[in-house]
Amino acid sequence: MKTSTYKTAAKSALNGKWGIAIGVFFLYFIISSILGVPENEWIFYVLMFLISGPLYIGYQWFHLELIRYNNPGVSTLFSGFTQNYLRNVAAYFMVNIFTILWLLLLIVPGIIKALAYSMTYFILRDRPEVSIFQAITESRRMMDGQKKKLFILILSFLPWVIIPSALIIIGLIAIFFTASDPILFLVGTVSLIIGLIANIGISIYLMPYFTTTLAVFYASNVPTSDPSLEPLLTDENPNLVEPTQ
C-alpha cells in the first residue's frame, strides 16, 4: 500500500475529530513535560517506566480507537493505567531495553529492531490475553517485510520539522557566536523565536496526524478475522469508512 494511502486515511479519520485529538495531545505533552524535569536521574527513570510508559501506550490506544470510529475520549489516554497496568509498564520496559541493547551494537540494527517492535502496544490493545513476549513476537512477525514501508512512512513526516529545526539551530548559533554583533544577535534571536513558535504549531498538527497514521498502518496490516478491527482501506479507496450501526 502507498505511503499516501495511509496518510489520507489518517486525515479521513481525524476529520471532525481534530479538537479532541489536539486536546489529548496537549494533555499528553503537558504531563510528559512535567515528568521530564525530575529532581534526580533515578526519579526520572522510575517515572519514565511507571507513568510515562502507560501514558504513551494510552496515547497510541487513543488513536487506534479514533480510526475505528469508537469516539474515544480523554479517558482513553489513561487506559494504559486502568487496563493491565503492570503488563503495560513491563511491556514499555522490555521494548525500550531491547531497542537500546540493539542500538548499543550499531545504529542501523537498532532502528530495524525499533521498527520491528513498533506494533507491540497496538497488539496489546487488541489482544489483552497475550503475554508481553507474545506481543513483541507478533509485532516482529507482522513487520516482517513491512519495516521498509514503515520507515519510508516515518521519513515522509520529516520535512515538517526540518525548517523550524533549522531556524532554531541557526538562531542558537547566531546568539552564542555573534553576541558582539547586535544585528546578527537580533537576527539570531528572531530566528530562534520563529523556529520555536513554528515547531510548537507544527507539533500540534503533526503529532496527532503522525500517531493516527501509525495506527492506520497497524490496522491495515493486522491479521484478523474480525472486520471491526480493521478499516476499509485500499489504494483505490484511501478513506476510512465509518461503520454503520
What is each stretch, according to the model?
Residues M1-Q245:
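Hydrophobic alpha-helical membrane segments
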